Structures are given as C-alpha cells and as structure tokens.
C-alpha cells in the first residue's frame, strides 16, 4: 500500500484558519521534499475535535468548512489527506475528500463507525485506544475486514498509566505488526498528559525524540506527528505538538533510522 517508504502522517492537530492550515502544509512539504524518495507524507488535520476536555475549548470549523479547507490543501500541494471521523454519518462525506479516514482512539471499538468508514473503501487508520492491549486490536481490524476493505493502518499512541499519564510499550509495535498491516507510532499524542491541566491536556514534548526513535528501532512503519508553526498558540494540543523547527531537525534522524532498520530486516529474511 505504501511500498517501502516510511509513512509520515503530519499536520496540525485541528484545522484553524485556512491561511494557517495552508502555511503549515507548505512548510511541511518544503521540509519533506528532499526525502521524497524515502518518505510517504500524508497531511492530517481534524475538522472537529469532539473529545476536548472542556466545553469551552475550540473544536474546529466543522465538517463542511473543514473538508473545504482540506480539499484546498489536497489540490494545492498534491498530498494525500487524513482526517478523523466520529460518527457513521460523517464517513461518506469525509471520504469524498480524504484518502484516509481515521478512527479516533476513544472510538476504536465502535462497530458502526468502523463499518461505515470501511465501506467507503478509503484507507482506514485505526488508533489503538489507551485502554486496549495491542492484541485487542484484532477486534477492530476484523470489523473493518468484514466489509471487504483490507486497506488498514494501525496506530499505537500509548496506554493509560495511572491518572493523567500515558506510557509507551514498544512491544506493541511487534504485536500489531503481526496482524499484517503497517504500524505507525503517534509520537505526539503519546507524550500527552490527558486532562493534566484540568481544562485541557498537558504534554511532555521533550520525550518526542526518544519515543519516536525507539518506535522506529522497534520496527514501526512510520510516524504520526502533529506539528505547528507555533505550538504555544495552537488552538488544540498546544502542550504536545512538535514545532516545525524541531520537526525539521528530527526528520533526517527518523529517515536514517528507518532506512537502517529496514536494511537490517531485509538482510535477516
């Protein structure tokens, strides 16, 4: 589905203004361009963050306006688009614009949502819930496969570890890989401190380099990275997003590590 290139799902957490979204997409494209032979970039952003901690938090522009902006990103930069869907009713509309439909971690066991998304025949990225073991992901996978759609990505994003904390078990990469689909590691949501700031989630971005390197070394097929020109003023997940400046510094490291691990795996076959 993605050949041997490293999958890189990257973009801002939520769609903000159209100008901001296009600016971020342009910068990511510029950063990724030198690695086009080795990296498969997919732009991601959400039209609605339906699970914000507070009723007062910004959720996004909504389905109609959000898809319009994502369509403009797709047309302007010629990039594949990923967004998350939250109900069966949203899946068909989102699939008209987006190449990949994402099932949010909190909703990864919702049968009707999984089936509706899969029936569009889009690629389905299932994010593993913080409450699931890696082997429990076989259930969501089977629900997607029941529709005849086998275009699946599995994303590991950490497990709940007590209150307001997550931990990443790299054994999950190996377990999920045995299901036969590309496994992506979410390097930014994995450093969240869910609800840690009362009305919104905190984050420990200083651990993004460590965890992303570990995931690639463990055999992940790619990374999911939320990034922003200025995370401090981002309207969602400001505490856990990676700055574009840091993204640019880390990208060659990720690329080299991915190529090294893939070379080792090929030599071991």
Curated annotation (Swiss-Prot):
Pfam families: DAHP_synth_1
UniProt pathway annotation: Carbohydrate biosynthesis; 3-deoxy-D-manno-octulosonate biosynthesis; 3-deoxy-D-manno-octulosonate from D-ribulose 5-phosphate: step 2/3; Bacterial outer membrane biogenesis; lipopolysaccharide biosynthesis
Top EC class, one word: transferase
Gene Ontology CC terms, in alphabetical order: cytoplasm
Keywords assigned by UniProt, alphabetized: Cytoplasm, Lipopolysaccharide biosynthesis, Transferase
Primary localisation category: cytoplasm
GO biological process: keto-3-deoxy-D-manno-octulosonic acid biosynthetic process
Cell location: Cytoplasm
EC assignment: 2.5.1.55
Reaction catalysis annotation: D-arabinose 5-phosphate + phosphoenolpyruvate + H2O = 3-deoxy-alpha-D-manno-2-octulosonate-8-phosphate + phosphate
Protein family: Belongs to the KdsA family.
Protein name: 2-dehydro-3-deoxyphosphooctonate aldolase
Organism encoding this protein: Chlamydia abortus (strain DSM 27085 / S26/3) (Chlamydophila abortus)
Biological classification of the source: Bacteria, Pseudomonadati, Chlamydiota, Chlamydiia, Chlamydiales
